[in-house]
Swiss-Prot record:
It catalyses: N-acetyl-(2S,6S)-2,6-diaminopimelate + H2O = (2S,6S)-2,6-diaminopimelate + acetate. The keyword Amino-acid biosynthesis applies. The lineage of its organism: Bacteria, Bacillati, Bacillota, Bacilli, Lactobacillales. Gene3D superfamilies: 3.30.70.360, Zn peptidases. GO terms for biological process: diaminopimelate biosynthetic process; lysine biosynthetic process via diaminopimelate. It comes from the Bacteria. Pathway: Amino-acid biosynthesis; L-lysine biosynthesis via DAP pathway; LL-2,6-diaminopimelate from (S)-tetrahydrodipicolinate (acetylase route): step 3/3. Catalyzes the conversion of N-acetyl-diaminopimelate to diaminopimelate and acetate. Its EC number is 3.5.1.47. This is N-acetyldiaminopimelate deacetylase. InterPro entries: AcetylDAP_deacetylase, Amidohydrolase, Bact_exopeptidase_dim_dom, Peptidase_M20, Peptidase_M20_dimer. The active site is at residues 70, 129. Belongs to the peptidase M20A family. N-acetyldiaminopimelate deacetylase subfamily. GO terms for molecular function: N-acetyldiaminopimelate deacetylase activity. It comes from Streptococcus thermophilus (strain ATCC BAA-491 / LMD-9).
Length: 377
């Protein structure tokens, strides 16, 4: 069947939902998938919470090729002014997952036309933005014997043009780790500091000392980011703060570097707390947001394939410090992620982010050729 990609994308754009709450999205996808797979006896389907797995049995399979899309939206008030803007107040597809889903449906439709030689799995994964849905599905055994031998996926990129595909043969996205540190001192009157134990001062020392991690502990060739964007302590001007809470993020291009920085954050927090004679709670939450590390051989193959197409402008790009939970699945299954240009002036997660819909036909056509090649390889 021929899909109306623009209509599908606009339908999905209107119903963004937060991770693991994508009930309308799942229902819409299931309806489209049912229409596409009717009468196809080589197709099986499973659901996992709000996720969907569609498996195409190959005619003479030697491996399973996987394609993954995320399906969740963001808690953002949309400001695009589009006729098909979000009908869910305070929710928006500001990260392009509506484009991702539509592309996946278009690719699935192409692969259904003739039974492929190899098995194929199409994964519609929930909760990329908030709960690392890929990790949750893997740990819960959702894949079973459908786990791919190779996994592929894309992410839209606003500053690249339609026709651009960008990736590299190593790390594409950073791994991320949330950091929440709470210093617990003793409150008191500002006029009697000797009777209190100022948590605000302790947290300030901590913030200053963690600046040495990147400058003195991290290999400058590898790099890393430690940023604290939130600091809360005290209630008014003349009361010494009993507690102080700092909230931040770690970004690294390798998991080894992430573990080193996490270790140093913990050591510094515990050291500062000890020097002030107070308690400290430390929360380090990485979960499934590991670095997105492309398999070098598969990435080289994919890049050579797209480079040979006159329709594709292939870009060998540098890594980005943004996070993506596809990194967890790529830590279990070799594969490749790449950027797809959507040519819009607004960045990802911006309330006015609006992709150029011409990217849809391009993506389905060019990526479809690659998947057909992999299906027969």
């Amino acid at each position: 069947m021929t899909l109306d990609l623009i209509k599908i994308r606009r339908d999905l754009h209107q119903i963004p939902e937060i991770g693991l709450e994508e009930f309308k999205t799942q229902a819409y996808l299931l309806e489209r998938i049912a229409e596409m797979t009717e009468g196809k006896d080589f197709v099986e389907q499973r659901t996992w919470r709000t996720g969907i797995l569609v498996f195409l049995h190959g005619s003479a399979p030697e491996k399973t090729i996987g394609w993954r899309t995320d399906i969740d939206g963001l808690p953002i008030v949309e400001e695009t002014g589009l006729d098909f803007k979000s009908i869910h107040e305070g929710r928006m597809h500001a990260c392009g997952h509506d484009i991702h889903m539509t592309t996946a449906l278009g690719l699935l439709d192409q692969m259904l036309q003739v039974q492929p030689k190899n098995n194929m799995l199409f994964l519609f994964q929930p909760a990329e933005e908030n709960e690392a849905g890929g990790m949750l599905m893997y740990e819960d055994g959702a894949f079973g014997d459908w786990l791919p031998d190779e996994f592929y996926g894309l992410h839209v990129r606003p500053d690249f043009k339609v026709g651009d595909i960008a990736t590299n043969t190593n790390t594409l996205f950073a791994g991320t780790c949330e950091v929440l540190v709470t210093f617990k001192g003793k409150g008191g009157h500002a006029a009697f500091p000797h009777e209190a134990n100022d948590a605000l001062v302790a947290a300030s020392y901590f913030i200053t000392q963690v600046q040495t991690i990147v400058s003195r502990n991290v290999d400058p060739i590898q790099g890393g980011v430690v940023t604290f964007g939130s600091f809360h302590a005290g209630t008014t001007n003349n009361v010494i703060a009993e507690t102080a809470e700092v909230y931040g993020t770690i970004r690294t291009l390798t998991q080894e570097m992430s573990l080193l920085i996490q270790k140093r954050v913990r050591q510094i927090a515990e050291g500062v707390a000890a020097s002030f004679g107070m308690e400290v709670d430390i929360m380090l939450k990485q979960g499934g947001y590991l670095p997105v590390e492309n398999n070098p051989a598969l990435a080289k193959e994919l890049m050579a394939f797209f480079d040979a197409s006159p329709m594709v402008n292939l870009i060998d790009c540098l890594p980005a410090m943004t996070g993506e939970d596809f990194g967890y699945l790529l830590s279990k299954v070799p594969g490749v992620m790449f950027w797809l240009g959507i040519d819009t002036p607004y960045a990802l997660h911006h309330p006015k982010m609006s992709p150029n819909e011409e990217a849809l036909a391009f993506a389905v056509s060019e990526i479809g050729k690659f998947l057909k090649y992999k299906a027969e390889d």
